Amino acid sequence: MTPILRLLLLSSLLSCWKQSVVGANSWWSLALNPVQRPEMFIIGAQPLCSQLTGLSPGQRKLCQLYQDHMVHIGEGAKTGIKECQHQFKHRRWNCSTVDNNSVFGRVMQIGSREAAFTYAISSAGVVNAISRACREGELSTCGCSRTPRPKDLPRDWLWGGCGDNVEYGYRFAKEFVDAREREKNFPKGSEEQARSLMNLQNNEAGRRAVYKLADVACKCHGVSGSCSLKTCWLQLADFRKVGEYIKEKYDSAASMRLNKRNKLEQVNQRFNPPTGEDLVYLDPSPDYCLYNETTGSLGTHGRQCNKTSEGMDGCELMCCGRGYDQFKTVQVERCHCKFQWCCFVKCKKCTEIVDQFVCK
């Protein structure tokens, strides 16, 4: 084989591998393309699962078995993406989506902290959505939580309200989300195997976050609100709390590498090894300052920044030292609100000219 042909073949193989990694979690596209409920399909129409793009063979089989789950998986993915964008709105990488089935584009081909967070928050979103759908009677294979009564619950409090079924949500999310990674058979010791192990670890960390933060909720019963009796159940934490928890894990994520036993090990052995609740990554993050088609970085040109902040949202860091443009904009807000009898609030509209700063 000539050197030119060898180079072309290598380039082609590298391109294919990158495309497979970019689309590695393309089930995320369920968040961007609304999933129709199974009952909306008429006789003779194509089955739901054949119309969904981005599913791996294993995920497609699960879709066929649990068609009523798919709309909630899409909702969970959407919840995860929105939370990702909230947590990173003041960072150079702000969890932007692109208009294709990869959802996040080439930025996910790097085994970075950002990829770790994205896998974790998406997996958490599925647990959250499926657990709640069980409680609301939306799914045929689950119902209210069957979690045993907590030992520290006062004896005179009743345990029996319809709780979020976190156990089922965790199990189903593990089966569905991890299916793509587990059905692959990468060569031992390869970069692809290391990345797959990284993805599985971060998927699990996201699921555990939802499970760990779920807590007991109670409702009072009694004459005139005397609360002489309480009924309690298991309830999911607000997903914002889950996002904040996983963001903390992002900040303390462990740098890993593949060892000779084909397991991930921590690069710095002086630190405690990560637990199943921790995020892990393989590659250093790009600086995300400039647009880069290869890494998927969209850059920070045109992003708003805070002139007075010294944090990541400050103009110096957000704009990567390139400077910023200042312009004035008119903001309209409700003001001078008064309660009117009965029963509404009447407000005036106030305009204010404010300075805004945008990265060059």
Swiss-Prot record:
A lipid is attached at residue 224 (O-palmitoleoyl serine). It comes from Xenopus laevis. InterPro entries: Wnt, Wnt_C, Wnt_CS. Glycans are attached at residues 94, 100, 292, 306. Ligand for members of the frizzled family of seven transmembrane receptors. Probable developmental protein. May be a signaling molecule which affects the development of discrete regions of tissues. Is likely to signal over only few cell diameters. GO terms for cellular component: extracellular space. Palmitoleoylation is required for efficient binding to frizzled receptors. Depalmitoleoylation leads to Wnt signaling pathway inhibition. Belongs to the Wnt family. Pfam families: wnt. It is found in: Secreted, Extracellular space, Extracellular matrix. GO terms for biological process: canonical Wnt signaling pathway; cell fate commitment; muscle cell differentiation; neuron differentiation; positive regulation of convergent extension involved in gastrulation; positive regulation of non-canonical Wnt signaling pathway. The keyword Iron-sulfur does not apply. One of its GO terms (molecular function) is cytokine activity. Gene3D superfamilies: 3.30.2460.20. Disulfide bonds join 84-95, 134-142, 144-162, 218-232, 220-227, 289-320, 305-315, 319-359, 335-350, 337-347, 342-343. Residues 1-16 form the signal peptide. Keywords: Developmental protein, Disulfide bond, Extracellular matrix, Glycoprotein, Lipoprotein, Secreted, Signal, Wnt signaling pathway. This is Protein Wnt-5b. PROSITE patterns: WNT1 (PS00246). PANTHER family: PROTEIN WNT-5B (PTHR12027:SF87), WNT RELATED (PTHR12027).
